[in-house]
Amino acid sequence: MTDLTTLTIAQARDALITKKLKATELTEAYLKAIELANPTLNAYVTITAEQARKMAAESDRRLAKGERGLLEGIPLGIKDLFATHGVHTQACSNILDGFKPNYESTITANLWQDGAVMLGKLNMDEFAMGSSNETSYYGPVISPWRKKDSNEKLVPGGSSGGSAAAVAAQICAGATATDTGGSIRQPAAFTGTVGIKPTYGRCSRWGVVAFASSLDQAGPIARDVRDCAILLRSMASFDEKDSTSVNLPVPDYESYLGKSIKGMKIGIPKEYYLAGMSQEIIDLWQKGINWLKEAGAEIRDISLPHTKYALPSYYIIAPAEASSNLARYDGVRFGLRVPGKDIIEMYENTRSVGFGDEVKRRILIGTYVLSSGYYDAGYLRAQKVRTLVKRDFDQCFDSGVDAILTPATPTPAFGIADEKIKNDAVAMYLNDIFTVPVNMAGLPGISVPAGLSSNGLPLGLQLIGKPFAEEVIFQIAHIIEQEAGIFCAKKWWI
């Protein structure tokens, strides 16, 4: 019998519609897979088995009556950043210890409305701050991928490492994730999965724990481009509760897959050729260029001159917004409370014990750049640079370019015990060098697997699109996927 967890969302959907499969059977298969994998991979921080069974049974009842939502009976994992009513929501931080919200995020509400089943909450970097999923209060996530002939434990990327690892390990059909500077696309590239950061404003941020509010955007991680397109259609919506939500129709992204890209203009930015970049990343990029050229696209060399300033300005803007957003966590009404002799000491004790080192580092940086005497020199200048980064992209798209192709990451996944990266914050931050400019400009970006490194690890390519043109980058990503194929990790943990 086919292992039901190997089915894509599209395949499972079709099997459920034709009654070859029941939602309860599919859910039980995933719960069993989680039971086998999670003690090793640590992808889930909460498993909602009984809730999943109940939701699946309700899906079966609807399917029996010929009623079905877009994701009817499809079991999903939810990043621990999304508020889920009555279920553990802690942003993988000790400071939110025991917090169970009495409300539902707009995105998860959309998914449940469409019939999806919740398997549980997924591990992540604390408050989404990290690129390796090592800053979580619940410990690191282990990637399902390994180097050839090696037992070294690898990172799945971050901050959505639990989402990417769970999808790659086939312990959920798809997952929600968030991306502030690359937290969907980098883990997707590291794990051979597909991840899209939609245009800022496409998906509601209501009920999603904030990191940097002007940069945060939610999106899906899935096994292939089609599954990603199906998930985004359900997740995206206009929401009056989010002042940055944009009231535009949500296309049927899946319907664009398989359409010709003949005549499309694809930009190749010279600034993304970094000094010291590995030859296999350059070769992968060239391979992607050739695939698109063979599919009829026109390749154009372009310049994004302010790209090199995007990362340093991001690491001023994001911590500044984080220090403001995280000021609300004080131990008074919910989460962790560490007693003190007075209220000030209680605040200090709670925040000192509740926040991890990386979160404290970013709060300190953010508070510093917003402080009197440094605001103009730091934060204000960084915002001006952000405007220039966005202007570069605008000029490029105004010149007729339909999408931009770049590598997704400068390297494949690295080891959990890699002290060089672990002890060097800048080296860790450089993981986001190709992804951060997209967040700074508020554009859609997708990471699609395009090959394997010499060590047998996944490598991804990134496509960047015009605002609210996610269907175009899905269309192009599908071409790359057809040429590159699908990459699956061996289940060494069973």
Swiss-Prot record:
Pfam family, one: Amidase
Transmembrane domains' residue ranges: none
Keywords recorded for this protein, A-Z: ATP-binding, Ligase, Nucleotide-binding, Protein biosynthesis
Any one biological process term the GO annotation gives: translation
Residues annotated as catalytic: 79, 159, 183
GO molecular function terms listed in the Swiss-Prot or TrEMBL record: ATP binding; glutaminyl-tRNA synthase (glutamine-hydrolyzing) activity
Protein task: Allows the formation of correctly charged Gln-tRNA(Gln) through the transamidation of misacylated Glu-tRNA(Gln) in organisms which lack glutaminyl-tRNA synthetase. The reaction takes place in the presence of glutamine and ATP through an activated gamma-phospho-Glu-tRNA(Gln).
Name by which UniProt lists this protein: Glutamyl-tRNA(Gln) amidotransferase subunit A
Designated gene of the protein: gatA
